[in-house]
Amino acid sequence: MGFVKATPEGKKYEKIANQINEYLDFIEAIGVNTSSVDYLNSVDFYTSHEALHLPFESALTRTDSISGKTFATSSHMVWIGDRTRFLDSAHVEYCSGIDNPIGIKCGPSLDPEELIKIIDKINPDNEPGKISLIFRYGKNKVRKYLPGLIDEITKNGKKVLWVSDPMHGNTIKSSSGLKTRDFSSLLNETSEAIKILKDKGCHLGGIHLEMTGQNVTECT
């Protein structure tokens, strides 16, 4: 994260971090052993990525000897991409065999009835928190597709978390041929999604963004 260091925010963060170290030094000076205090030595940090390369995921899959549950240890949560989201795909089969939370990307090509079958395969017990539906329609299509998807999920009583991915449906090419996204399009799709979900008695549970501090046109 070297690009952060030269920014005003980076300097502000460094100042705060140094102050925290000073406070910890003071605590140790008065006799408190900070190494024995768990919350001073660790942080909850969660990761997620697409379960795309199955040989990689399989090599990092483990079964817990105590609970007997099987986990993909490459990430806390993995998701199935829009192009690998079909009932008989190897990716759906893999995700049905692990106990991690699973995301499912939902684009305009989605068949809602097939999605119900996929959810049943991955989450047969309809466990809350297991499935996140990450919809990626674009600002001009979210009103067309999202209401019907919500209706299908509600009709079948599926417990899901709704997550907006305003990145992939709003990709455009600049005059120079570079792929990019207009930030206003991201805001528009997300705002529209919040309204649609609210009208259907649901709420937005998260947003999927691709971010970087570097000069990358595809991210924001």
Each PLM stretch: what is its role?
Residues 1-138, 178-182, 189, 203-210, ...:
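Active-site-facing alpha/beta catalytic cores
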Residues 135-214:
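Extended C-terminal subregions enriched in glycine
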